[in-house]
Swiss-Prot record:
The lineage of its organism: Bacteria, Bacillati, Bacillota, Clostridia, Lachnospirales. InterPro entries: Ribosomal_bL9, Ribosomal_bL9/RNase_H1_N, Ribosomal_bL9_bac/chp, Ribosomal_bL9_C, Ribosomal_bL9_C_sf, Ribosomal_bL9_N, Ribosomal_bL9_N_sf. GO terms for biological process: translation. GO terms for cellular component: ribonucleoprotein complex; ribosome. Coiled coil: none annotated. Keywords: Ribonucleoprotein, Ribosomal protein, RNA-binding, rRNA-binding. This is Large ribosomal subunit protein bL9. It comes from the Bacteria.
């Protein structure tokens, strides 16, 4: 019997796959536990429609990430860092401060977890901070750390 998996089933496959299993295994294990449904023409059509919808949503997310990347690339965020005599700084700038400054100055809601900053910024100057907006889209945000 052919079955469409509704969840990942360890020995059989992943969600959305069509697998061939014995009739007894399907009727006594897969279908009652709602791990899958029989691959009838109606269910196959529903699966096809779900896949088309998922592809469309993924494409829209990708396009919106590209549009946001263009905005992020052209944005300069200014963050103030306390400093003393001789240019010695106190404290550091983390992704949390950069995210808050981007929201305050430009209205950009950037997730601090998506900023790929290896270590905190501890000196004055200009920095490029990579922001992963989508698995395929990364943009560089310009951060200017000034004396404040």
């Amino acid at each position: 019997m052919k079955v469409i998996l509704l969840q990942d089933v360890k020995p059989l496959g992943k969600k959305g796959e069509i697998v061939n299993v014995s009739d007894g295994y399907a009727r006594n294990n897969i279908i009652p536990k709602k791990l899958g449904v029989e691959a009838t023409p109606k269910n196959l059509n529903d699966l096809k429609l779900q896949n088309q919808h998922a592809d469309k949503v993924a494409q829209e997310n990708y396009e919106s990430a590209l549009a946001l990347a263009k905005v992020v690339e052209n944005t300069k965020v200014v963050v103030k860092l306390r400093s003393g005599e001789g240019g010695r700084t106190f404290g550091s700038i983390s992704t949390k401060e950069i995210s808050a400054a981007a929201k305050e100055q430009h209205g950009l809601e950037l997730d601090k977890k998506k900023m790929q900053l290896n270590e905190s910024i501890k000196a004055l100057g200009n920095y490029e901070v990579p922001v992963k907006l989508h698995p395929k889209v990364t943009a560089n945000l310009t951060v200017s750390v000034v004396e404040g």
